[in-house]
Regions:
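Periplasmic solute-binding protein
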Residues: 1, 9, 28-67, 155-164, ...
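Bilobed periplasmic-binding protein-like "clamshell/Venus-flytrap" ligand-binding domains
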Residues: 16-29, 184-195, 274-282
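Flexible glycine/proline-enriched surface loops and loop-helix/loop-strand junctions
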Residues: 20-27, 62-72, 92, 110, ...
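Extracytoplasmic/periplasmic substrate-binding proteins
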Residues: 38-41, 45-46, 80-174
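C-terminal lobe and pocket-closing loops
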Residues: 122-134, 147-249, 281
Length: 282
């Protein structure tokens, strides 16, 4: 399996056979949020976060984000390598790639028309639970292949559950109890047994019953022990949604051939700087 971006491109090229309706790879390339996420993840694959975070062992330090002393780092050498990598991926992608997001990408993979795909484990049931899918039982799971000099990263996604600030006081204990139940090992195992392919608990992921259901759990556990599961590729700052949208617009123009990579990087950086100026200094 490919562990570097160069090896990934070589594999995609070898597996790409459009005359037979087979394409090498799929990824989120739809305009806006979908492609914006892809650029952030590609940037991480080349060893750089979207913010000027200080490096630490195993990644980058996100402990001081609340101080708001950061800037976005898009127009960089790593940014250019990431942009050029996306252009290379385009060569071995299906013709509708520029309108593909999460679901549009996983469906043709499950149907066997795409050899490889980037994706979160959340959508793995599309093929793992489909006995008619060619991908069922024939899929392996890897962290993102890394660019030259970088380490493999598996970006963490997920959802946050919390208590609304306006919740009446008398309802708080029941809400807290519900959160405890939802996130308990027993509930997490029940989700997996009923089709879920995500799990935030080590104890459940190492449960033999769970391990037998899908190879995902052993693969993700191994990524965690290798310190490959990281959330710095998509740092939780107030501006991140707008920055993702900006990247998804400018790099979509690049993939369509409207502007070159350097221009896409410059435009995205200028727009990101304007966002920072607006949010941090007003």
């Amino acid at each position: 399996p490919p562990t570097t971006t160069d090896a990934l491109l070589n594999a995609a090229k070898a597996l790409h056979d459009p005359k037979r309706g087979q394409h090498g790879i799929a990824w989120n390339a739809a305009r806006g949020t979908a492609l914006g996420h892809t650029f952030l993840m590609a940037l991480a694959d080349f060893g750089q976060p979207i913010l000027d975070l200080p490096p630490i062992a195993g990644g980058f330090d996100t402990r001081h984000l609340s101080e708001r002393r950061y800037r976005f780092t898009i127009d960089t050498d790593a940014g250019l390598r990431a942009a050029e990598f996306l252009l290379e991926l385009l060569k071995y992608s299906p013709p509708e790639i520029l309108s593909m997001s999460w679901y549009e990408r996983i469906r043709p993979y499950a149907a066997g028309r795409i050899a490889m795909t980037y994706g979160y484990t959340l959508l793995a049931p599309y093929f793992e639970l489909d006995k008619n899918s060619p991908a069922q039982g024939n899929t392996g799971y890897l962290p993102h292949p890394a660019g030259s000099g970088a380490n493999p990263v598996a970006p963490v996604g997920g959802y946050i559950m919390g208590l609304p600030a306006n919740l009446p006081v008398d309802r708080v204990p029941a809400a807290v109890e519900a959160l405890i139940v939802f996130t308990s090992p027993a509930a997490q195992k029940l989700y997996v047994q009923n089709g879920s392919r995500t799990n935030p608990r080590y104890s459940v992921g190492s449960d033999p019953d769970v391990r037998r259901i899908s190879p995902i759990f052993e693969a993700v556990d191994a990524m965690s022990w290798r310190d490959e599961l990281q959330f710095w590729p998509r740092p939780p700052v107030p501006e991140i949604g707008e920055i993702i949208q900006i990247c998804g617009e400018e790099f979509h123009n690049m993939l369509r051939g409207i502007i070159p990579p350097q221009e896409a990087l410059r435009r995205a950086q200028q727009r990101a700087d304007a966002v920072i100026k607006k949010t941090q200094f007003t």
